[in-house]
Amino acid sequence: MSLSDFNQGIYLVITTEVDKKNASKLADLLLREKLIPCVTFKNVESHFWWKGEINQSKEVQLMIKCKEENVNKVRNKISEWHSYELPEIIYFRVSANKNYHQWVNSI
C-alpha cells in the first residue's frame, strides 16, 4: 500500500435504530449492496429533545465503517430505509492501521 492509498479515506458513520431488528435490517441492506465492509452494534440509552419534550429511549447504535467513495451512498440509504422520522446520521473521516485501512477500501 502506497501513501497515495491513504488518500482514499475511511469513514465512520454513526446512527441509532429503535431496536436490534431494525438495526439488523439496515446493516444487512448496506452489507448486501457492498457499501460497507462491517458494522458494529451497541445498546445505548439516548436522552433528547423531540417535539417540545425531553425524551429518553433505549436504542441500538450502529457504528458503520465505509470507504470514502461510499459515504454519501451510505448516508442516502440510511435516510431512505431508517425507521425514524429524523434519523441521526453522524459521519467523519477516521484513521486506522494500514491493514484495516486496506481491508475497508477493498470492499
Report residues per predicted region:
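Positively charged, small/polar-rich N-terminal and surface patches that mediate targeting and assembly
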Residues: M1-I107
